Amino acid sequence: MVSLKKKSKRRTTRLRSRIEKKAAESKRKQKRADKKNPQWKSRIPKDPGIPNSFPYKDKILAEIEEQKRIREEEKLARRASGQVDAAMEEEDAVDENGSLMISKIAEAAQASNPDDEEEFVMEEDNLGEAPLLVDSESYEASVKADTSRKAYDKEFKKVVEASDVILYVLDARDPEGTRSKDVERQVLASSAEEKRLIFVINKIDLVPSEVLNKWVTYLRNFFPTIPMRSASGSGNSNLKHQSASASSTISNLLKSLKSYSAKKKLKSSLTVGVIGYPNVGKSSVINALVNRSANGRSAPCPAGNVAGMTTSLREVKLDNKLRLVDSPGIVFPSSDSKDDLYRLVMLNAVSSTKVDDPVAVASYILQFLSRVPGQLERMFQRYELPPLLNTSDIDTATDFLVNIARKRGRLGRGGIPNLNAAANIVINDWHAGRIEWWAEPEVINEKNSSEVQDTQIVTEWAKEFDLNDF
């Protein structure tokens, strides 16, 4: 029996297109109906979050934010370390090529004149000499094992002993607050008599010209002082100094260091140590000098708006005559009082997470602003707040934070303002530089005239670096 042929599934194009249109329209109608259906639920389970009735909700949220911040810092540090490793590999390749070239020249010189062999070898050693400050692997292991104050003090002493010139970086908004006389005494008491100390006032774009001139005049009574604008300026900065741009100040500092190195006729390269409080811009100064000396070179030191970005010694070679050493920021508190801790948090030298009472830090900031006329009013204008009626410091701080909490929606159950959340807003804006502030230098009188250095010494040091251009 002959088998029947199977029926063909072939259809006309007209029928096939009509079926496709019907199917698409049906899917579109179903999708529209699903959107209108109030019983529609996502397949992904939604996190209900922390209930408002939970008593420790603020602490848990703070811990979550802190963990996020730590992860971001670790990510930035890993990225920066990768860039540094790449830069170091490039330097090693350049050094290898240079050493090969030197060896070839030495062979040619020896063949032409054998008597000059010893002199040439000495010059070659001087070109390649680099003071070994610290073994990076052993230092990282020691820091992981012990990150206490003693460990950082030990590294600070290494920087001072190994450096010929010390650049003490200060914040232009409060140079006296970011200055430690203990550091100056340790530098002057070091074994090397030829060691020089220079004040570098960084972040000058955040203060008016009149205030900057006062601070430069005041600090030059102690040590040679240089105003510096290491970065191109923050987005919140609206204070411009036409005579002190970033390129001009960096170029002048680089010329001064090279001039001092040429006058001293050092056999090895000049080692410049950069020290200062956390978050004053030490790494930014080094990155600016590197970028200026080597056109377009990537930044070798990680820099950021968070205190403690630099955790180990970092040596950067500019050329055969100049080396820079970046050091971790070390805090030298004057006392163990709460006010001194609040002052360090205000300077962003210590993280605000180290303080249990952010309201006290915000109150300290308000007290600081009230000392300089007009600064407290400018901060009220920034937050668009009306003038406060209370006269006492405690009442003023409380009313200020209550207004901030209401304006930013930081309210708890029953509409009660969350003062801690409002204080954290103020502290974060302060650290980010969104609030303008600066301190005024004190007048030198008989009480503090004993701390002033010898005028002749300061003048001689300034001449050695040709600092008359600043």
UniProtKB/Swiss-Prot annotation:
Region (Disordered): 1-56
SUPFAM superfamilies: P-loop containing nucleoside triphosphate hydrolases (SSF52540)
Record keywords, A-Z: GTP-binding, Nucleotide-binding, Nucleus, Protein transport, Ribosome biogenesis, RNA-binding, rRNA processing, Transport
Protein's UniProt name: GTPase grn1
Domain of life: Eukaryota
Function in brief: Required for optimal growth. Required for normal processing of ribosomal pre-rRNA. Required for nuclear export of ribosomal protein rpl2501.
InterPro entries hit by this protein: G_CP_dom, Gnl3_N_dom, GTP-bd, GTP-bd_ortho_bundle_sf, P-loop_NTPase, TRAFAC_YlqF/YawG_RiboMat
